[in-house]
Amino acid sequence: MIDITLPLTDIHRHLDGNIRAQTILDLGRQFNIALPAQTLETLIPHVQVTSTEPDLVSFLTKLDWGVKVLASLDACRRVAFENIEDAARNGLHYVELRFSPGYMAMAHQLPIAGVVEAVIDGVRDGCNTFGVEARLIGIMSRTFGEAACLQELDALLAHREKITALDLAGDELGFPGSLFLSHFNRARDAGWHITVHAGEAAGPESIWQAIRELGAERIGHGVKAVEDRALMDFLAQQRIGIESCLTSNIQTSTVASLADHPLKTFLEHGVLASLNTDDPAVQGVDIIHEYHVAAPAAGLSREQIRQAQINGLEIAFLSDSEKRALREKVAAA
């Protein structure tokens, strides 16, 4: 179902949600951190979703073991490098990796700006080694509150030239976007693109707020948009992209089943929706699974899957010339 003549992208992919189980085991042993299991086979149920979680917050706890072993900046650099290696193995030409430096720093009180620098270094080295093109999106973890998000923002702005966009993720219901208006004003002043997790746990009003008040050019997940016809029209007319993550939305109980997922409706409505993974290691999936298994199960035709692939590059945070160069590179391969 993947069109090999077109660039394959993943523009909603959490770097700190894609820490390999083997790496968690390795780092746990290296730093003498007590893990819930001592073999790869027995560790996986603790770090990977093996059945549907009751809600988004429950799903997010599966990410915690990955960051609990980040006891040094070198460990952060390693997982960033491995994220690019994983992207290359999946056949991705372009990936936007998003990460929350405060979340990665928290367990071992690492310097947040140091985490940002380590991630930048690891991703750069990975891109040079594996030939994948990547951009970084900084996340503010709303769950930890406004002050913690300000610390994350300051650390990200210290490396503003290496960061492409700002995102807001975490507990959407408990920490609405209205708490973070000044944060996003600063991000836009820095020249960054804006994407926001919205309409995943909360309703269409969260998406409207992300667009109108935070300046979102893309929406992460956005599944509740289908509940508001005016919003659907607005998304299509204004070319505001939706970063769809099929398997993730089932695992978080955001959507009841793949057959109920709104991605097909988005595409039929002319919304620029794309296919992405979200947290591949935690979910136990990759981009190939999303195209070959999840998308057909969600009712997408072959042409709709191809359109979603096209949309992934269309709404990527790249210039027109960068997109053109990537298309030409893939076409010539």
Swiss-Prot record:
Write the Enzyme Commission number(s) for this entry.
3.5.4.4
Q: Does the keyword Hydrolase apply?
A: yes
Specify the enzyme's EC class, one word. Answer: hydrolase
Q: Does the keyword Signal apply?
A: no
User: What is the catalytic activity of this protein?
Assistant: adenosine + H2O + H(+) = inosine + NH4(+); 2'-deoxyadenosine + H2O + H(+) = 2'-deoxyinosine + NH4(+)
Similarity-based family: Belongs to the metallo-dependent hydrolases superfamily. Adenosine and AMP deaminases family. Adenosine deaminase subfamily.
- The protein's name: Adenosine deaminase
Organism the protein comes from: Salmonella typhi
